[in-house]
Amino acid sequence: MAHIVKIYDTCIGCTQCVRACPLDVLEMVPWDGCKASQMASAPRTEDCVGCKRCETACPTDFLSVRVYLGSESTRSMGLSY
């Protein structure tokens, strides 16, 4: 079952989530929205196994990276009927 990895604009560009991911699902991309001038991106979500290490590593009060597992993804993204 596919997982959705969502990066929110509260990302501070610290790279903690990228370093925590054992499967290199995440990478940093240029972004002018924070002091670090970069933010996390999830170009390889098909490789995500749902371990949520990226969430655990995120230091922001509102998790900037969220992993929605399987059926949770449609409910969390507001797609359930």
From Swiss-Prot:
Impact upon substituting V49I: Leads to partial destabilization of PSI. Unable to grow photoautotrophically
Protein name as it appears in the record: Photosystem I iron-sulfur center
GO biological process: photosynthesis; photosynthetic electron transport in photosystem I
Mode of membrane association: Peripheral membrane protein
Enzyme class, broadest EC rank: oxidoreductase
Matches recorded under InterPro entries: 4Fe4S_Fe-S-bd, 4Fe4S_Fe_S_CS, PSI_iron-sulfur_center, PSI_PsaC
Residues that hold [4Fe-4S] cluster 1 according to the record: C11, C14, C17, C58
Keyword Chaperone annotated: no
Reaction equation(s) it catalyzes: reduced [plastocyanin] + hnu + oxidized [2Fe-2S]-[ferredoxin] = oxidized [plastocyanin] + reduced [2Fe-2S]-[ferredoxin]
Function as written in the Swiss-Prot or TrEMBL entry: Apoprotein for the two 4Fe-4S centers FA and FB of photosystem I (PSI); essential for photochemical activity. FB is the terminal electron acceptor of PSI, donating electrons to ferredoxin. The C-terminus interacts with PsaA/B/D and helps assemble the protein into the PSI complex. Required for binding of PsaD and PsaE to PSI. PSI is a plastocyanin/cytochrome c6-ferredoxin oxidoreductase, converting photonic excitation into a charge separation, which transfers an electron from the donor P700 chlorophyll pair to the spectroscopically characterized acceptors A0, A1, FX, FA and FB in turn.
Keyword tags: 4Fe-4S, Chloroplast, Electron transport, Iron, Iron-sulfur, Membrane, Metal-binding, Oxidoreductase, Photosynthesis, Photosystem I, Plastid, Repeat, Thylakoid, Transport
PANTHER family named in the record: PHOTOSYSTEM I IRON-SULFUR CENTER, PHOTOSYSTEM I IRON-SULFUR CENTER-RELATED
Cofactor: [4Fe-4S] cluster
Xref: NCBIfam families: PS_I_psaC (TIGR03048)
The 4Fe-4S ferredoxin-type domain, residue ranges: 2-31, 39-68
The protein's Enzyme Commission number: 1.97.1.12
Origin species: Chlamydomonas reinhardtii
Gene Ontology CC: chloroplast thylakoid membrane; photosystem I
Effect of K35T: Drastically decreases affinity of PSI for ferredoxin. Decreases cross-linking of ferredoxin to PSI-D and PSI-E
Subcellular location: Plastid, Chloroplast thylakoid membrane
Note describing how the cofactor binds: Binds 2 [4Fe-4S] clusters. Cluster 2 is most probably the spectroscopically characterized electron acceptor FA and cluster 1 is most probably FB.
Name of the gene: psaC
